[in-house]
């Protein structure tokens, strides 16, 4: 029996940023963690900033996504994002600095509501980048220090 693969496409406003095949795609949607394989029920979900794992046979592509929407059909996964980076292209020091800067804003009692919202978004993105980096290295990352 021939193995069937999902078609996977990650698109941003700039166009397709990742195309491939997978026997399993794992990600966090609005309802929690999802594992998607060939033949999956159709669904549409929002995505927070996080990690998408695209596995084909013994190889896994680890992707950081800034958040967006995922559309699943039995044969295809399409992820629409504002931004996507492969984990191997992420910079750990930059992500850690962004996390520290965001936490400093959140600790500032004089920060405006707009600054707090922006800092919360940057903190979630930095945490997701660190999780993607550590997932690709086989490490576990906890955002609670």
From Swiss-Prot:
Superkingdom per UniProt: Bacteria
Name of the encoding gene: atpC
Subunit: F-type ATPases have 2 components, CF(1) - the catalytic core - and CF(0) - the membrane proton channel. CF(1) has five subunits: alpha(3), beta(3), gamma(1), delta(1), epsilon(1). CF(0) has three main subunits: a, b and c.
Protein name: ATP synthase epsilon chain
Keyword Membrane: yes
Sequence similarity: Belongs to the ATPase epsilon chain family.
UniProt KW Cell membrane keyword: yes
Species in which this protein is naturally found: Francisella tularensis subsp. mediasiatica (strain FSC147)
Membrane topology: Peripheral membrane protein
């Amino acid at each position: 029996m021939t193995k069937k693969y999902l078609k996977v496409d990650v698109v941003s406003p700039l166009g397709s940023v990742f195309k491939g095949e997978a026997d399993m795609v794992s990600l966090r949607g609005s309802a929690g963690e999802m594992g998607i394989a060939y033949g999956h029920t159709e669904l549409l979900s929002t995505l927070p900033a996080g990690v998408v794992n695209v596995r084909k046979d013994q190889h896994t592509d680890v992707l950081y996504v800034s958040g967006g929407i995922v559309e699943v059909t039995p044969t295809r996964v399409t992820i629409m994002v504002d931004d996507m980076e492969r984990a191997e292209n992420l910079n750990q020091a930059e992500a850690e600095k962004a996390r520290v800067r965001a936490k400093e804003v959140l600790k500032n009692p004089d920060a405006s509501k707009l600054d707090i919202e922006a800092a919360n978004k940057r903190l979630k993105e930095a945490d997701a980048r660190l999780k993607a980096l550590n997932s690709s290295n086989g490490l576990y990352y906890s955002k609670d220090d």
